[in-house]
Regions:
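SAM-dependent transferase fold signal centered on methyltransferase-like domains
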Residues: 1-201
Length: 201
């Protein structure tokens, strides 16, 4: 995000996004892609400022599309997960369903080697940008959980934990309830998860 775009985001943080979207002609200096990104950043901040009270105050923090903002963990939830995981004797952590990266970010405060895995290009780029602002030691992998597992962790290291929070929606967007219908398929991956790590959650 350029400094000019960042300034515009800050200037309009409290504006009505729907009204701002109708004022495209006021910003001829912005490409259509930049204008959409401007709206996305303002909308994301407004939707997550209560859920992410600390992160939302960081200059140049970036926000993904609406659904990802709605589905991400709150800071409180991510900190609680991190506290629980920090009590395990591990030094390597891999989040195979990285998403917006909030869980990964807080867990990385307790573990020296952290892998964030996300197949969505835009989410991955935003997470990488945000990690660089807070915890640059997080290793980012723009790939699927399956592909990452194929190449990572040759054996079940005693100090490795693999974490997954699969999408509970089908490719068509409808809700699913069985583990084998989630994406990625935990049931199918479970033998590999057990082979490659001491802990799975």
């Amino acid at each position: 995000m350029t400094s000019d775009l960042s300034t515009l985001v800050f200037k309009h943080l409290h504006d009505d996004v729907q009204q701002l979207a109708l004022q495209r002609n006021r910003y001829p200096q912005l490409s259509d892609a930049d204008f959409r990104f401007l709206l996305q950043q303002i909308d994301g901040w407004q939707r997550t400022k209560s859920k992410l009270p600390t992160l939302s105050q960081i200059p140049n923090w970036q926000y993904p599309v609406r659904l990802s903002c709605e589905q991400c963990s709150s800071e409180a939830t991510a900190k609680y997960k991190a506290l629980l995981i920090s009590q395990l004797p591990i030094n390597t952590f891999a989040d195979l369903t990285g998403g917006y990266g909030i869980d990964t970010l807080y867990i990385s405060e307790h573990i020296p080697t952290v892998h964030y895995v996300e197949r969505n290009n835009e989410l991955c780029a935003i997470a990488q940008h945000n990690f660089a602002l807070q915890h640059p030691h997080i290793q980012v992998h723009n790939t699927t959980a399956e592909s990452f597992l194929d190449s990572a962790f040759s054996s079940a290291a005693e100090t490795t934990l693999i974490y997954m929070d699969p999408a509970r929606r089908s490719s068509s967007g409808s809700k699913v309830f069985r583990l084998e219908d989630c994406e990625p398929n935990i049931v199918e991956l479970l033998p590999t998860l057990r082979l490659k790590s001491r802990y799975q959650c």
